[in-house]
Every structure is written in C-alpha cells, then in structure tokens.
C-alpha cells in the first residue's frame, strides 16, 4: 500500500465484498461455503456481502479480521469509506449551515 497517495474523490471506494470476492477468497483456495463456515455465518449472509448487497458489519469485520489475520479495523474502515462516499452523494445537506470550526468545538463560557 502506498501511504500518502491521494485517491480520486469522484471514484467510489471499493466495497469490502468486492475485495473478498475478487482477491481474498480466491487466494485462500477455499470455497465460499467453506469461508462462511469458518466465519460462523450463513452462506447467504456471505454471498450477500460478496454481491455488495449487505455491508460488512462490525461483528463480521471482527470475524474477517481473525480469519485473515489483518484485524477488524481494515474491514470496518473499508466499509465506512464506501458508506460515507454514498451518503455524501445521497444526503441533501444544502439546508444545513457550516459553522466556523472553532465555534463548533468551543465550550461556551460560564
């Protein structure tokens, strides 16, 4: 991984299911059903993640992190980036003002 590289903000981040489907699971030599069993989740749940129909929940991220040895944070951050990118394009925030950052974080004097 290249640190400090800027990604194109117009490109949707990869759904963790796509990474699992295209790279991670094939590299194990195991079937999707075997991976689901090892994770302790249903095949349907795993298939929904792989088809990008369901997000990787924190609970599943913990299981993935243990199984693949990379920790839950990788999967949680990947899902958060994907979800945030979509939310920023779907949510209408035009009626919400932007406060000066200092004012937003200062406590009022008492």
Across the structure, where does each feature detected by a protein language model lie?
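A short, Lys/Arg-rich alpha-helix, primarily the initiator
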Residues: 5-30
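The alpha-helix within a helix-turn-helix
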Residues: 25, 36, 65
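Short, basic-rich loop-to-helix N-cap that marks the start of a DNA-contacting helix
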Residues: 53-66
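Short alpha-helical DNA-recognition segment
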Residues: 29-48
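General marker for long, soluble alpha-helical cores
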Residues: 1-3
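The DNA-recognition helices of helix-turn-helix-type DNA-binding domains
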Residues: 42, 53, 68, 79-82
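DNA-binding alpha-helical recognition surfaces that contact promoter or target DNA
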Residues: 48, 62, 77
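Short, charged recognition helix plus adjacent turn
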Residues: 76-110
């Amino acid at each position: 991984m290249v640190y400090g590289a800027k990604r194109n903000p117009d490109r949707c981040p990869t759904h963790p299911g796509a990474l699992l489907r295209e790279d991670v699971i094939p590299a194990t030599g195991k079937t999707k059903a075997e991976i689901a069993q090892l994770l302790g989740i249903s095949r349907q749940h795993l298939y929904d993640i792989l088809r990008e129909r369901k997000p990787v929940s924190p609970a599943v991220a913990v299981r993935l992190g243990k199984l693949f040895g990379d920790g839950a944070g990788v999967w949680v951050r990947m899902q958060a980036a994907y979800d945030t990118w979509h939310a920023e394009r779907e949510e209408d925030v035009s009626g919400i003002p932007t406060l000066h950052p200092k004012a937003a974080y200062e406590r009022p004097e008492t």
